[in-house]
Amino acid sequence: MPAQKGRPACHCSDLRMCVSRCLRCVGVALVTLATVCTVANILLLLPELKVHFLLEGHVTREASWATGLWSSGLLVVIGARAFLQSRHTPGCCAFRTQMLRQALYSCACLLSSAFCCLVSITGLVQGPLCLYNTTSGSAWGVPLQPTADRDAGYLYNRSLWSGVCLEPKGVVQWNVVLFSILGGASGLQALLCAANVINTLLGVVLGRSAGDNKVSPVSA
């Protein structure tokens, strides 16, 4: 009887295609979330949609750090661009090298988005910079920040949202909504990047073995 050739248990090309497809999906999601972070941070810099607060330095510290622009914005977009440009690479060795680069990009995006998320949570807990009444008159400060004798209860006490800050108008609601959006979007970025690290490392580990795992021809 003629020799019967066995079918490969799994194909390296199939693995490459699957990993590359996941990379492109993550890239699209990261670009979308980076756009959300950028818009949210720009709005945080413009209370009441007026630029004079920014020019006078009367903007919440965590918003002025602009992590939504450069950390969860520009840096993540650079990484996402690399994911979107991922192509089918012939040869398992070349594929594993590409996956190592993508893993490094994923780690960088993970760190930058996690940093933005941490800054956003801090800004949310600390409260906004605003003009408020003191015993010596009106002054700029952060009246809602937690102190030794007071916790961060302003988030759960809406009566403080309109009764403490005089300017910018509605700045408490403004910051709560936008910092929540910024923190949530950057947190999702961090989760996607963490999953992408696992995805690319699996590609590195399994890339070669998937190509070598074949059934030898069996002679009758």
Residue ranges: model-predicted function:
Residues H58-R61, A94-F95, L104-I181:
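Disulfide- and glycan-decorated extracellular loop modules of small multi-pass membrane proteins
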Residues P168-S209:
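A hydrophobic membrane-anchoring alpha-helix module
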Residues C37, L43, K50-F53, P128-Y132, ...:
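Short, flexible/disordered secondary-structure transition segments
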Residues M1-D14, C92-F95, P143, D149, ...:
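Intrinsically disordered cytoplasmic terminal tails of membrane proteins
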Residues T38-L45, S71-G91, C109-L124, Y154-L160, ...:
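Cytoplasm-facing ends of alpha-helical transmembrane segments in multi-pass membrane proteins
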Residues P2-C107:
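N-terminal helical submodule of small eukaryotic multi-pass membrane proteins
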Residues G27-A34, S106-C109, S113, F179, ...:
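Residues within membrane-spanning alpha-helices of integral membrane proteins
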